A protein has these predicted regions:
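Conserved active-site-adjacent core of cysteine acyl-enzyme catalytic domains
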Residues: 1-121, 217, 223-298
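Conserved catalytic-core surface of thiol
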Residues: 86-191
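Catalytic-core signature of thiol
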Residues: 1-26, 142-145, 149-208, 212, ...
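A broad detector of the eukaryotic-type serine/threonine protein kinase catalytic domain
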Residues: 181, 193, 220-221, 241
Length: 299
């Protein structure tokens, strides 16, 4: 599969469940983390080839393609709240992070053994019994150097940084210890800028999103209060460079938008900080980005 993707000009990333480290002191399993990575790419509008293997390991495998996801479920939200992530270093003052990818378990698949566009649970994607997801093959463009695991690591580090974290930048809009829901996805900067310019109000903020230099591809982390996620109205967002090398960490940061403030870095800036900041007149919420996937109602 990866060879075919390479021949079509992609730079495929292959993820195998056995390569994921165990989570100490956590109820999150390897399967959960692999599903999160799948969700980030699907939320980015990128189709993912899925390889399934037998749970017992004594039967042949199977493959399919995932192209979408189902709706968030309240039962999964309750579980996600219990699985929220807290930085050990800042455990006494951190804002717990809830991963919105944990709100979903249903995915739209194309499988030669099923009618097209079936919505199946991640734990039962195949019609064959006792099959589990073991690997993912993701067709990234050659200039997308920062993949989902590295982007997640960078965002987590930024959210808990002593200079750039939530405790500093969101202290005026969050209560002490308030949980934050994060939504991660990749987008083209052109589409992202156009969406922000169309959906935000205010001349200054529209102009800033239009003029801020960005690479062709970006990772976006939208930040939500728990009660605002269902309506996809974020209080803030972080944008990092999807074409950046993984070892650049905070130097891949492009933009942070919080109530009444936008800060961004120039492309030639080496240090992990901001060269430009702009104060906004209002603290309007940010509409969640909706251009990667189309919502389809099944009748």
């Amino acid at each position: 599969m990866t060879k075919v993707l390479s021949e079509f000009g992609f730079s495929p990333r292959l993820y195998h469940i056995s390569a994921i480290d165990d989570f100490e002191y956590s109820s999150i399993r390897r399967e959960n983390e692999l599903r999160r990575w799948l969700h980030y790419y699907i939320e980015s509008g990128i189709p993912v080839a899925i390889g399934l293997g037998s749970v017992e390991g004594n039967e042949s495998g199977h493959s399919m393609v995932c192209i979408g996801h189902g709706k968030a479920k309240d039962t999964l939200k309750n579980q996600a709240y219990r699985n929220r992530w807290i930085s050990w270093e800042n455990r006494n003052q951190a804002h717990p992070i809830i991963n919105s990818a944990d709100f979903y378990e249903d995915y739209v698949v194309v499988d030669d053994n099923q009618p097209v566009y079936q919505v199946r649970s991640f734990d039962n994607l195949s019609l064959y019994p006792n099959m589990r997801v073991e690997n993912l093959a993701v067709p990234l463009y050659k200039r997308m150097f920062l993949d989902a695991p590295d982007a997640t690591s960078t965002i987590r580090s930024l959210l808990n940084d002593e200079r750039l974290g939530l405790n500093v930048w969101a202290k005026d809009c969050l209560h002490e210890g308030e949980s934050v829901v994060v939504r991660m996805f990749m987008a083209s900067s052109r589409s992202y800028k156009a969406f922000r310019a169309k959906t935000l109000s205010g001349v200054l903020v529209k102009e800033l999103y239009t003029l801020i230099p960005m690479p062709r591809f970006i990772w976006v982390c939208e930040l939500y209060r728990i009660g605002d996620y269902d309506n996809l109205m974020a209080f803030g967002e972080i944008v990092i460079d999807a074409t950046s090398a993984p070892n650049r960490s905070h130097q891949s940061l492009i933009l942070m938008h919080y109530p009444k403030l936008i800060a961004y870095r120039e492309p030639d800036q080496n240090e992990a900080g901001f060269s430009k900041m702009a104060e906004l007149q209002s603290d309007q919420l940010i509409p969640g980005y909706r251009r990667n996937l189309d919502e389809i109602t099944l009748e």
